[in-house]
Amino acid sequence: ITSDEIQQILIKSASDLISLENPNYQYVAARLLLFSLRKSLHHRLWEHPHLKEHVNNCIKLGVYDDEFLNWYDEEEINTMNDMIKHDRDYIFSYAGLRQVIDKYLVQDRSSGQVFETPQFMYLMIAATLFRNYDKEKRLSYVKKYYNAISQHNINIPTPVMAGVRTPLRQFSSCVLVDSDDTLPSIFSSDMAIGRYVAQRAGIGINAGRIRGINSRIRGGEVQHTGVIPFLKKFEATVKCCTQNGVRGGSATVHFPIWHQEIEDIIVLKNNKGTEDNRVRKLDYSIQLSELFYKRFIENKEITLFSPHDVPGLYEAFGTPEFDELYEKYERATSVKKKKIGAQELFLSILKERAETGRIYIMNIDHCNTHSSFKDVVRMSNLCQEITLPTDPLQHIDGAGEIALCILSAINLGALKNKEELENLCDLSVRGLEELIDLQKYPVKAAEISTKARRSLGIGYIGLAHFLAKNKLKYESPDAWKLVDEYTEAFQYYLLKASNQLAVEKGQCEYFNKTKYSDAILPIDTYKKDVDSLVKRKLSYDWSTLRKNIKEQGLRHSTLSAQMPSESSSVVSNETNGIEPPRDY
């Protein structure tokens, strides 16, 4: 038996002993796993190669970006080598280190050979992000960012952790693709989806414009096949790539509740039916507005339409003009329609949601009321935390707008005090800002809009840990007050950081397409019913910030999002996102 086989037996034995009663075995197993990694990589446990030697080796192997040595001189590389704290590898729990090794460290996935340790990964990410900063200050930012991510104060998502430092430059977690009701648009959207799925992105698809089954085409020459055949095409594209072995492709498709085929759409994931009338490997988001909630409460009917038969209705969805136009089409005798009880339809949606767990609800009017954009938001992303404007493609290299969002999160569970948020928010914004120009864009419509809007999504992980640390429960008024205080600081410091970057680099090109350009801030648009739950005054100087934003602008169109962080939070040994803990 080899020493490596003995080590693997020890790792498994220690991991099998992890329990609620004996949680510290997670660190025993992690250390054994770490020593196995170091031995296979460096052939020793305690000594590590110099950063330059490590980088040269990885460049020769083709797993690191070969431009790195052009960015930094030898003196800077020596300084960065001294920054690395390899003992921080001991911070990992077993699950966290296992996740890092399996998903994030650069490696040959066919042979299983890993080429870096976690601390080299973190340092290379920080060095790559701040490569374009002035030479006098960039190493200071590299050190601060390295310290923040290696100590798990800032959480970075899968595309960033797996991709920054490598030749594959695609770091957006969220890609939103909007399809029109034409074959060129549907096929162009499908190609765009394929290109981004292959590069680690999660996909949001808007198919709400596609006309319903048996609709007339070319004056009745052809009857439409409906949405399901096109969803099958999207499904095949999403699932044909395993995203470089990092994660499988996934997508959420969006439809308005008034779509003609909604009754067939909401059952697409269940286990009844046949392969011909089910599309189970996609998730679905059903879009509602206040009108439909009123119909539900009053036990009235909802009228279903094919979007093609009601010109302008889809474009009005999510705006104040929708209700009047919708009721006008309900009265029109010449328009093909179908009526269904609102309560019957709602209960069907809730039943499928309860049984499959992957049918989401998107309140489209609420999203537009509270968004930072003047443009209408028509869809969300894979995990439903992002609301960005989109415009359908008509050709893969043509006009349109594919929305991209790069994510990160502040680890609330690791915070010692609220004042730490200022530095962490600034570092998060600056780091993600650099990725927008570093990454490559496989579709032109994504590059144009992303560089013009510069959308970021920075959120929380570890909220449950944070509350537990403060001896508070989710349902406690004291918890609401504390979260309100921290979230005010969080929003304030994100906006302050973006405003400072606007001073340094200029406001984003589409700043005037945001509500921020009219000095409308999150403190103006949040749902005021919150004030009945948390009675306190604002703590920060919002009036000065408002003035600065009005005069100097922001570098980003939007800054915050509460992503689920299901896999990346495991690395930090934290509860995911803002979610409460689930049963053991």
Residue locations for each model-derived region?
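Extended catalytic cores of very large enzyme megasubunits
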Residues: I1-Y584
